[in-house]
Amino acid sequence: MKGSFKRLIAIFMLFLHMVSLADGIVPDNGVSKNLQLDKTANGVPLVNIEAPDNNGISHNVYKEYNVDGRGTILNNSKDLTNSQLGGLIYGNPNLQNSSEASTIINEVSGVNRSRIEGYQEIAGKKANYILVNPNGIYVNGADLSILEM
C-alpha cells in the first residue's frame, strides 16, 4: 500500500511537471499592457502584438513564450487578412491608431527557457523578428513564415 501511494505521487509529479512545460504563451501584463492572446477558428494561438513605437518596433514581453505543434500567429495587420496557419483573421486592435511594426521583439521575462516546436507566422506586414530569452531557447521542428498581404 505504501509503495503504491509513492508511485501515485511520483506519477502525479511527473504530469505536473509536463503541464508546467506546456504553459504556452503568457503575457507579462506588468510590462506589456496591451498584448492580447486569442485563438483562430481552427484553434491556432493568435498574438495581437503591441503597437510599435516611432521607430516601428513592437516590444512584447511575456512570462512564458512557447510554441507547440499548432504554431502561433503574430498579428501585424490592421485589417482582415489571411494567414497560412489560421485562415482568415481579424485586424489587430492594437494597430488601429498606429502603423504596422517593422520589427517585432518578443522578450521573455520569466525564469523558463522557451520551447519552439512549431511554426511562427507573422501575418500582415512583413517585419523583422527577434525572440529574446536569457534562459535559453529550445528549438525542434520550428519555422518562421512572414506573409505580406
Report residues per predicted region.
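Bacterial N-terminal signal peptides that target proteins for export
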Residues: M1-I9
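Bacterial N-terminal signal peptides
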Residues: I9-S20
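Solvent-exposed adhesion/ligand-recognition segments of exported proteins
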Residues: L21-M149
